[in-house]
Amino acid sequence: MARDYPLDRYRNFGIMAHIDAGKTTCSERILYYTGKSHNIGEVHDGAATMDWMEQEQERGITITSAATTTFWERTEDGETADTPKHRLNIIDTPGHVDFTIEVERSLAVLDGAVCVLDANAGVEPQTETVWRQADRYKVPRIVFVNKMDKIGADFFNCVHMIEDRTGARAVPVAIPIGSENELEGLVDLVTMQEWVYKGDDLGASWVKGEIRDSLKDVCEEWRGKMIEAAVEEDDDAMMEYLEGNEPDVPTLRALLRKGTLALHFVPVLGGSAFKNKGVQPLLNAVIDYLPSPLDVVDYMGFAPGDENEERNIPRRADDDMPFSGLAFKIMNDPFVGSLTFTRIYSGTMNKGDTVLNSTKGKKERIGRMMMMHSNNREEIEEAFAGDIIALAGLKDTTTGDTLCDVKEPVVLETMTFPDPVIEIAVEPKTKNDQEKMSQGLARLAAEDPSFRVETDIESGQTIMKGMGELHLDILVDRLKREFKVEANIGAPQVAYRETIGHEVEHTYTHKKQSGGSGQFAEVKLVISPTEPGEGYSFESKIVGGAVPKEYIPGVEKGIKSVMDSGPLAGFPVIDFKVALVDGKFHDVDSSVLAFEIAARMGMREGMKKAGAKLLEPVMKVEVVTPEEYTGGIIGDLTSRRGQVTGQEPRGNAVAINAFVPLANMFGYINTLRSMSSGRAQFTMQFDHYDPVPANISQEIQEKFA
């Protein structure tokens, strides 16, 4: 079966933004105008099509990136006949910091992105975080300045903020007409026409016309800047322009596309998704400026089992290449069970095929294949390069795994997931729910690699670990709704770590004589701190056989056994290195086990000598507040052992930046609300580990020892 849409008419893109910038509303409108959604869902009614998990609808924030396929016929200048439809695969990504991992996962499979800004707030902290992630994955993007109908909306301020905050060059291609209550439509700077929305058909129709006199000067000025950016992409166009000839509309679009794909600049449009103004021009811009799978450089993978991960196997969007795809999201669907969202990079896949999961080295059979529309699904028989589809019934595949042709194995990606910074104990309210809870938690952990479940060996409690309070709140909530488990949760605990203060040399002798063969081993260890974030390393410097080779793995095993439980309060030990420099052995009484015990005991004693210290996670906090509350908020952050690093004006508010220990941030949202009458908001994310002050360290040791 041939593909319905040629690859140059595919657009795989994500919609990314800060929480509350109106991202889900934008996705909704896109689905409405492209005919995939028959009624408009409003986020503040809790009925948006993309937000299909119940809690997302209740909290009005997007948590999981639902992938949706829809189609758009480019609305051409003056006529719509004969313009081929494009196939849009949209990934809706969350904007809350606790879900940054979701954004990372979706960026790994996108070709382009639409960044949605709030016209009043501009570039907010989470926008910067997501922008940096998109830079890392080299994702071309366009910006939609949304909420132009809001009080205080300022399109040009947002354009300057993009340049100040992200360092990108912002090039407006469409300017809003009016703002706040007087938003009428926009001016397309490429064609120099007004689009004015009239009537109450939810923005489905508009009138195009000449630019009004009051806007001509500002439009000419910004069009000049746009053309200057465009002609820099092509020497001939630049020469023509310097001779006084402007490029025609198709040439201008082609040059703007070239610059966007090369990440030289970012096209910017304005409008209001909620008021249904400016969404069709945004869709046109997606087609004009964002990449198709053919515009993306070859994806370089490596051979399974290659320890150096030498990326020398190319895969590109071509149906004739061997099949390869990346599983980027697992979701539980109440009707179909587990769904694996997969981006196909090369080749084709048919129902019934057997493919290789090259990350795990296991084969999977393709049962049901679906094209997803938010939470409706369409069964398909075949999928092609460039498609984003959902597969049901895969047994061993998790987020970040590569699926590929059995005969042509390749690994596309190794996704790294951050360590959790917060944990809570959880137990079912009734004993009967224990098994249901365990199954539910295992499923949630399969969906979300930044969430971990462990059992505390000493207390037997089940521990949930995640990226923030909201993250764990929502998971506990999902246990209740999807798995019908009522759970009691303990107070949140901080994920402390331990490390050492200075280098020591320590010798430990292990002797045991109790009739028969005894145990003997002596090790001399040098234990040293490393730079923060460098982790652990072990080196044997034994010369002349002071410790026979076969016993050295025992030494390393003994050292590693101490890493999970440090000498101060039993927390994992990080950022240190150990060298085995000398030792003694006995021909009869020495064994691997004896050396393991000697190393373990030597480490415990040596670390205490090395000035073991407790480390705590420190969060980067940003509070955005009306000016009158700044004094109180700064005082409160300082009282939480926070270090305020600066403040700056943000629109008509003030942004306060600080580093605060996570231990002092629990329940902060309630304090902030009461201090600012609900008008301030904050974001925080893990930044680094810092030593805990001595008096507090003592309390923690007494509590956990």
From Swiss-Prot:
PANTHER family: RIBOSOME-RELEASING FACTOR 2, MITOCHONDRIAL, TRANSLATION ELONGATION FACTOR G-RELATED. It comes from the Bacteria. GO terms for biological process: ribosome disassembly. Keywords: Cytoplasm, Elongation factor, GTP-binding, Nucleotide-binding, Protein biosynthesis. GO terms for cellular component: cytoplasm. It is found in: Cytoplasm. Residues 8-294 form the tr-type G domain. Pfam families: EF-G_D2, EFG_C, EFG_III, EFG_IV, GTP_EFTU. Signal peptide: none annotated. One of its GO terms (molecular function) is GTP binding. Catalyzes the GTP-dependent ribosomal translocation step during translation elongation. During this step, the ribosome changes from the pre-translocational (PRE) to the post-translocational (POST) state as the newly formed A-site-bound peptidyl-tRNA and P-site-bound deacylated tRNA move to the P and E sites, respectively. Catalyzes the coordinated movement of the two tRNA molecules, the mRNA and conformational changes in the ribosome. This is Elongation factor G. The keyword Zinc does not apply. It comes from Dinoroseobacter shibae (strain DSM 16493 / NCIMB 14021 / DFL 12). GTP binds at residues 17-24, 92-96, 146-149. Belongs to the TRAFAC class translation factor GTPase superfamily. Classic translation factor GTPase family. EF-G/EF-2 subfamily. HAMAP family: EF_G_EF_2_B (MF_00054_B). The keyword GTP-binding applies. Transmembrane segments: none annotated.
